[in-house]
Amino acid sequence: MKDVALGIDIGGTNTKFGFVDRDGHLYAETSVPTTKTPPDDIDAFLKYLYDEIELLKKEIAEELTIVGVGIGAPNGNYFTGTIEYAPNLSFRGVVPLVELFKKYYNVPMVLTNDANAAAIGEMIYGGAKGMRDFIMVTLGTGLGSGFVANGELVYGHDGFAGEMGHILQKPTGRTCGLGRRGCLESYVSATGIKRTVFKLLADMNDPTPLRDVTYNQLAAKQITELAHQGDPIAREAFDYTSRLLGQKLSDMVAIFSPEAIFLLGGLAKAGDELLFKPTKRYMEEYMFQVFRDKVKILPSALEDKNAAVLGASALAWKELGVNKHLREMPTPK
């Protein structure tokens, strides 16, 4: 029988989970659609998630004992165990996730922002090993971020520090999932780049297969594939996205002075040519000169190993008092 932590990453599109032992060995992982159950029915979702977790557990030859649970979720509050007003989830308002999920697993349980969980995973198991100051940016349905300063994850006074996706890009701009106007994630995310494409289709006359696709049919992956093939609309969309991301990262560098910035998520898979190099170029262009050529922009070293699941499980092991990799972190209230 093997003791494991259950690591869960709740995203706007998919929820990933896996079993991780105290040494960071990932026994098994899978993903399920976050939108499988009726919108705004958190009880139905958690029951569905529990059933899927138990199915995966039964597929493993070795008998596993879940001794702790770590969860990463948009707007997950480490101090309160609640998801609060997450723009890209159908669960609205304040959701007492830890309290509700303990009905299924009555073990030590901790919740944090999904990007914070990814940052912890990168710091312990990935490319940020040995780094004391770095930023993790997750580019999925929305834009998440986790900030590590002086070797510690920054939670802030109330647990919501590091919401880079909701800093203003344009005060009168696009509406985000929370109804705010001009948030960065409404431009720089899988959803944001789709909106950019449809704006460009109206402004440009270039022929493109994108004109034959409806908004609901279009996926960021298709935009990426067309951009690699030289499609002018898709390439312009990536350039615009990279410019906005580079601008805001230059601001973050001026505040935090990180050693590196890691990009993770579906949009980050666009690679060097479409995203990393142009983002770095724009960041340097807008950078306060004392920081120029000092900050690396890197892909997550855990892209294929699920940084958020590993990070969430690491937090669970920390709650159990056996994770020696993490420095002391504040105790949830």
Q: Residues of each region from the PLM?
A:
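Short, flexible active-site-adjacent loop segments at beta-strand->alpha-helix junctions, enriched
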Residues: 75, 89, 115, 173, ...
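Conserved PLP phosphate-binding loop immediately N-terminal to the Schiff-base lysine helix
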Residues: 112-126
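Short beta-strand segments
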Residues: 9, 70-74, 112, 136-142, ...
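Short glycine/serine/threonine-rich phosphate/pyrophosphate-binding segments
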Residues: 14-16, 117-119, 142-144
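Active-site nucleophile and cofactor-binding loops and adjacent substrate-binding regions
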Residues: 87-91, 110-116, 136-139, 298-306
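ATP-binding/phosphotransfer module of carbohydrate and carboxylate kinases, centering on a glycine-rich
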Residues: 1-68, 78-82, 99-107, 124-131, ...
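Glycine-rich phosphate-binding loop of actin/hexokinase-like ATP-binding domains
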Residues: 129-188, 324
